[in-house]
């Protein structure tokens, strides 16, 4: 890659993002602008995938809302994301957890990673 492009993208990378992977439960604080009013909206769920690297990296969070699965994809370096909190680290054996889309209730649970 061109050194000039590398330098420009390095300036735009966020360094305040916590370390999280697929299977972790996170709470994403998103800035929502409605007219002139700005507020923070939280989206809490399980990270089902991380994709890409550098400036174009994204992650997808899935949650259940009134029995309906809702997935939202966020760029890692999105300025609209105020903060990401990692609530628990899940123990999974896959990088992409697409199988959670077919599971409901207790079958969709993810075991918590043991400390040690």
Swiss-Prot record:
UniProt superkingdom: Bacteria
MF terms in GO: structural constituent of ribosome
GO CC terms: cytosolic large ribosomal subunit
SUPFAM superfamilies for this protein: Translation proteins SH3-like domain
InterPro entries: Ribosomal_bL19 (IPR001857), Ribosomal_bL19_CS (IPR018257), Ribosomal_bL19_sf (IPR038657), Translation_prot_SH3-like_sf (IPR008991)
Record has Ribonucleoprotein as a keyword: yes
GO BP annotations listed: translation
Keywords: Ribonucleoprotein, Ribosomal protein
Pfam families: Ribosomal_L19
Annotated PANTHER family: LARGE RIBOSOMAL SUBUNIT PROTEIN BL19M, RIBOSOMAL PROTEIN L19
HAMAP family cross-referenced by the UniProt entry: Ribosomal_bL19
NCBIfam families membership: rplS_bact
Record function comment: This protein is located at the 30S-50S ribosomal subunit interface and may play a role in the structure and function of the aminoacyl-tRNA binding site.
UniProt family annotation: Belongs to the bacterial ribosomal protein bL19 family.
Full protein name: Large ribosomal subunit protein bL19
